[in-house]
Amino acid sequence: MSQHPTKFDVHHHFVPDFYVEALEANGGDPSGWTIPKWTLESSETLMENIGIGTTIFSMTAPGPSIHKDPSEAASLARKTNTFAAAVRDSNPQKFGFFAALPSLLNKESAISEIRYAIDELKADGVTLFTRYGPDNHYLGHPDFQEIWQELNDRSAVVFVHPTHGVDTNLVAPSLPQPMIDYPHETTRTAMDIILSGTVRKYKNCKIILSHAGGTLPYLALRVAAMMPHTPFGKSNGLSTDEIIEDAKSFYFDLALSGNEFTLGLLLKFAKPGHILFGSDFPYAPTKGIEYFTESFDKYEFSEEERAAINRGNAEALFPRFQVAQ
């Protein structure tokens, strides 16, 4: 494993002009968040300023699903992935990308894009949102099993990013959903794919949870300790230890989470090698990203732990980026 000193950012978004146009044509971001201005140069500036050597780009929610028409959503996904591949090809050791997909509710379209993006464009993984559709189709829903099978067959890296809940009413006008609700959406879908057996069935998938797993490390044992002893536990048959084992199987990025309180818990919870650096640029304010990065850089890790989280763990997950010794 390389000891390359620069950070490897697995949570970094791009916002091409054609996506901004799609958002604006469909009423804006349903989460209530402001659409940021983005250029490749702005990403490179952030990378230089906080010491990022490699970035995996992804399109955040709502992604291609902003189009309700399935053909328009499929077209936007294809355009996004073609754009991302061109950025990657401009500097393959500096950039990678997670493929954007149409809504998983349009199964054939989503599977087609998985095959094209991974098999033809050589995407580094795919982005899945925490839920799809007008109801609670979280990622453990039976309708998504064929999609998970496609990903499992390819040993895909699956980057799980939160999206807005069914209820888009805000807690307060000053608290848009990405600020406070998104981590809970991540926890919901993570527990759903555990209790539905999805994690155990599709073991080849390497699943990254955004934002240090939301509240999963804090709440996993609450579910695990009670579930086997309730009527609800009969449907999955998982023991307390099995639920925790599956919860620990995830990878966790540190986007907006590199602080002493979150790190203190996550280092105890996550498996060795499963914590990754993330920035959440450009949706997070640059000052916020700098704050969390500085907090992370000041945290009292061993040098080996710091090097692993900064880059080594990501290089193990994405071997094409490993730097020759």
Swiss-Prot record:
Residues passing through the membrane, by range: none
UniProt keyword terms in alphabetical order: Decarboxylase, Lyase, Metal-binding, Zinc
Tagged with keyword Nucleotide-binding: no
Family membership noted in the UniProt record: Belongs to the metallo-dependent hydrolases superfamily. ACMSD family.
Broad enzyme group: lyase
Protein's name in the database: 6-methylsalicylic acid decarboxylase
Function, as annotated: 6-methylsalicylic acid decarboxylase; part of the gene cluster that mediates the biosynthesis of sesquiterpenyl epoxy-cyclohexenoids (SECs) such as anthrobotrisins and arthrosporols, metabolites that possess a novel hybrid carbon skeleton consisting of a polyketide-derived epoxycyclohexenol combined with a terpenoid-derived monocyclic sesquiterpenol substructure (PKS-PTS hybrid). The SEC pathway plays an important role for fungal soil colonization via decreasing fungal nematode-capturing ability.
Catalysed reaction, written as an equation: 6-methylsalicylate + H(+) = 3-methylphenol + CO2
Upregulation: Expression is down-regulated by the cluster-specific transcription factor AOL_s00215g275. Expression is also down-regulated by the HOG1-MAPK pathway downstream transcription factor MSN2.
Superkingdom: Eukaryota
A GO molecular-function annotation: 6-methylsalicylate decarboxylase activity
EC number annotated for this UniProt entry: 4.1.1.52
Pathway(s) annotated for this protein in UniProt: Secondary metabolite biosynthesis; terpenoid biosynthesis
Residues involved in Zn(2+) binding: H11, H13, H161, D280
Assembly description: Monomer.
Gene Ontology BP, a term: terpenoid biosynthetic process
InterPro entries found in the cross-reference section: ACMSD, Amidohydro-rel, Metal_Hydrolase
